[in-house]
C-alpha cells in the first residue's frame, strides 16, 4: 500500500497520486497568478502552491481532480506544505478511483446508523421520538455519508454520523451521572443539532458550502425542519420549542454562530459535548501524525496551538 501524504517527514520526497480537495486562485506579489491546492488521500490533506499558473490551469487542477505529483515536504508557518516539482492530471487508462483517496470514519456507516437508531428506540417521550425518527428517516442517506464540516473536525466521509455516535456515548455517561437531565431531549438534540449540514454542505467529496448553507446555515435550516416535522406529525407541544432551542444554542455564543445562548440544562450540556468531541477529534488526528517527543502542526481552531505527544506514550 502506498505511503499516505501525512506520513511523510520534512525533507522527504513525495511521488504519488493525490486528490485535489480544493483549488483557490490567487495573485502573487509579482502580479502573477497562482493556485493554492489542498491535496488529500486517506491519511489526510496538505497544502501546495502551483506558482505561475497558466490560463487553463484553474480548470485543469479543479477540485475533485486526481493528480500525480512529485515534490518535497517543507515546514512553513507551523504546518507542513508540499513544494511541487511536477504535477499532472491522471490519464484515463490509469484507472484510479476518487474513493481511493477519501478519508472515512473508523466505524462502518451501517453500524453507526444502527447505534443511532437504538438510541431513538430507547426514547420514552413519544413526541421527541417521533420528530427525531421522522427527520432521520428523511435525511438518513445523506446523514450517513456526509462529513461534519469542511475543515477542523470530522471533515471526512461519514464524519457527521461518527461525531453524533461519539456524542451520544458521552451523553449516556453524563446522564447516568446527572439523572436530572432529560435523556430523550439531550439524545434528540445531539442527533439533530448538525443534521442541517446535509443541506448546508455539498456532499462528502471536495466539500464546500451550498448557496443555502452560505445564506441560511445549518442551525436555521434545522430549526425550520423541526417545525415542519412537528406540523406534519400533528405535534403541538413544548418539547418542539425546547428542541429548537437546543439546536439554536448549541454553538454556545452569538460570536460562535448561535442566535441564542443555552437557556435550559440540556442545551448547555449539548454545547459542552459538541465542543469536547470536536476538540478531541482535532487533537487525536493531529497527534496521529507525530512521534513521541514531537509537537503537532498548529491547529487553527484550537487557538493555533501545537500539541505535544509525551515520550512515555511510546
UniProtKB/Swiss-Prot annotation:
Residues 163-279 form the HD domain. Belongs to the YhaM family. GO terms for molecular function: 3'-5'-RNA exonuclease activity. This is 3'-5' exoribonuclease YhaM. CDD domains: HDc, YhaM_OBF_like. The gene is yhaM. Keywords: Exonuclease, Hydrolase, Nuclease. Shows a 3'-5' exoribonuclease activity. Its EC number is 3.1.-.-. Pfam families: HD. It is an enzyme of class 3 (hydrolase). GO terms for biological process: rRNA 3'-end processing.
